[in-house]
Amino acid sequence: MESAATPHKSELRKTPLNGLHRRLGAKMVNFGGWDMPVEYPSSGGLIAEHRAVRGSVGVFDVSHMGDIRIRSGGKPGGALAAVQHISMNDASKLAIGQAHYSAMLYPQGTFVDDVIVHRLSEDGFLLVINAGTREKDINWVRENTKSFDCVIEDLSDAYTQLAIQGPQAVNLLQQLTDAELSTIKNYWFMPATVCGLKNTLIARTG
């Protein structure tokens, strides 16, 4: 029996790869209101998938996570000032193409969410937030940056996110892009073309 707070199966949100997961035979579950794959039985199940990631490579659909772009409004510096206000790590130290792990906190010091902050340009940042708190986080960011000269854009539904993990992750992805992945250091990223898709960002933040 479903509780009133549990979304009906038809109401579950879906990532752009949902149809592909189903065609490939994934076992789908309700993950925080999203219809997500928990395992692929044809691959041998959870233990086999775990071992594949530890010993080789695994690909995860994390498109349910949120993406918030913050850019300056009419004057330079507005985006940086806003990011400095809402996150704990010092974003002024980030070079363009660099990212860091950070946190958004309530005034009493408890967590709104943990985030990864990417510096896209001198006056542009991308915040990757967790799926379960996506709407809450976006509303909180909008509310707490009202006094800053910046533009807040929710890009969560505009992009598909894949996490490629394991010791062979670089080797796998290198076959799909002309970008030289060996030049991407930990917590750096670069724009690239992957599988012919030009509007792609490759980040080494795992």
Residue locations for each model-derived region?
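Basic, glycine/lysine-rich polyanion-binding surfaces/domains
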Residues: 1-206
